[in-house]
Swiss-Prot record:
Residues 28-213 are cytoplasmic. One of its GO terms (biological process) is adaptive immune memory response involving T cells and B cells. It is found in: Golgi apparatus membrane. The chain crosses the membrane at residues 7-27. Keywords: Apoptosis, Coiled coil, Golgi apparatus, Membrane, Phosphoprotein, Signal-anchor, Transmembrane, Transmembrane helix. The modification Phosphotyrosine is found at Y94. The coiled coil domain is necessary for the homodimerization. This is Receptor-binding cancer antigen expressed on SiSo cells. GO terms for cellular component: Golgi apparatus; Golgi membrane; secretory granule. InterPro entries: Cancer-assoc_antigen_RCAS1. The keyword Transmembrane applies.
Amino acid sequence: MAITQFRLFKVCTCLATVLSFLKRLICRSGRGRKLSGDQITLPTTVDYSSVPKQTDVEEWTSWDEDAPTSVKIEGGTGNAAAQQNSLEQLEPDYFKDMTPTIRKTQKIVIKKREPLSFGVPDGSTGFSSRLAATQDMPFIHQSSELGDLDTWQENSNAWEEEEDAAWQAEEVLRQQKIADREKRAAEQQRKKMEKEAQRLLKKEQNKMGVKLS
């Protein structure tokens, strides 16, 4: 009886080992199939018939061979000239106000008066006639506008007289200032002497009051 039980145990253990071995094989084959299914296989051959054909490359010098050589515009010159003339007419003249106006200087003629001359009894000479020809002295009036400048005769005596008059006026003013300064100094000296006299008088009065007391 014990021998039969031992044999049954051996058979069961052998079956268990076989089943476990088969189970391991089945698991390994399933895992290998999953890994092989995840991988993507790429084709190793290339079909050149599917590649589009490229056009032949042309040289850049042959690009303008078919282009027109000349372009003719009819009526363009006249329109451009008319448009330019209209633009010139519409453009304002910015320098119109800057052009100077030239005016001639006015001349004032002063007649020289002649002294009265008494004639001799024979009547050869008499009073000077007002209608007689006199020597005219031109006087030029300087205009503020731009104009022609005539020659002007300079009178040296007149300049000297004006300088003498100006020097005399300056001398008179200087003398007057000196006189005013001396007058103020004398007035200050007089006031100072009056104050000194009043002070001495008060001092004497105070002394006399002390003696009487």
